[in-house]
């Protein structure tokens, strides 16, 4: 079993992923953390020194490497789940879960974040990116509302996984 969590930045993928992995008693991996470990740089530093294209390629490589593991929960970066090729790859290897949040919730959660390169863009550009990515994220196997407390999001995912296993 491989569970991939996708969604926009600040949707709660890492928090939910950590809790979900504990509930299932399987390891949790955060693609962003693994990218930073591999490069020895923060994500903003990678963007600045090597560019977004390099980061996106590396992110997909890390995803593929993590997907060699069995029985894992993998939290993806916001851009990875919006990459159709990456999303199709994840769907072929496991179950994709879209943690959906309203744009207003994203703004509230991310307002103090200095570590996210995409937040340097104008607000209307971020809103457009949010809407574009949401269309792709919606192709996930399971969709949950991420504005609820993380423990409730985990319960909803677990129920959906049970339903999928039973053919529901």
Swiss-Prot record:
It catalyses: shikimate + ATP = 3-phosphoshikimate + ADP + H(+). Keywords: Amino-acid biosynthesis, Aromatic amino acid biosynthesis, ATP-binding, Cytoplasm, Kinase, Magnesium, Metal-binding, Nucleotide-binding, Transferase. Its cofactor is Mg(2+). Its EC number is 2.7.1.71. One of its GO terms (molecular function) is shikimate kinase activity. Mg(2+) binds at residue 14. It is found in: Cytoplasm. This is Shikimate kinase. It comes from Aquifex aeolicus (strain VF5). The lineage of its organism: Bacteria, Pseudomonadati, Aquificota, Aquificia, Aquificales.
């Amino acid at each position: 079993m491989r569970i991939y969590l996708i969604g926009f930045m600040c949707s709660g993928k890492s928090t939910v992923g950590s809790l979900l992995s504990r509930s299932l008693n399987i390891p949790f991996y955060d693609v962003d953390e693994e990218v930073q470990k591999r490069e020895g740089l923060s994500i903003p530093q990678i963007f600045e020194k090597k560019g977004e294209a390099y980061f996106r390629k590396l992110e997909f490589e890390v995803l593929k490497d993590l997907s060699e593991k069995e029985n894992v929960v993998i939290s993806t970066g916001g851009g990875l789940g919006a990459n159709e090729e990456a999303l199709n790859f994840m769907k072929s290897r496991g179950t994709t879960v879209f943690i959906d949040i309203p744009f207003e919730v994203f703004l509230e959660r991310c307002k103090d974040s200095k570590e996210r390169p995409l937040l340097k863009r104008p607000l209307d550009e971020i809103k457009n990116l949010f809407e574009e990515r949401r269309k792709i994220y919606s192709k996930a196997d399971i969709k949950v509302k991420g504005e609820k407390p993380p423990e409730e999001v985990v319960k909803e995912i677990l129920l959906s996984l049970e339903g999928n296993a039973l053919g529901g």
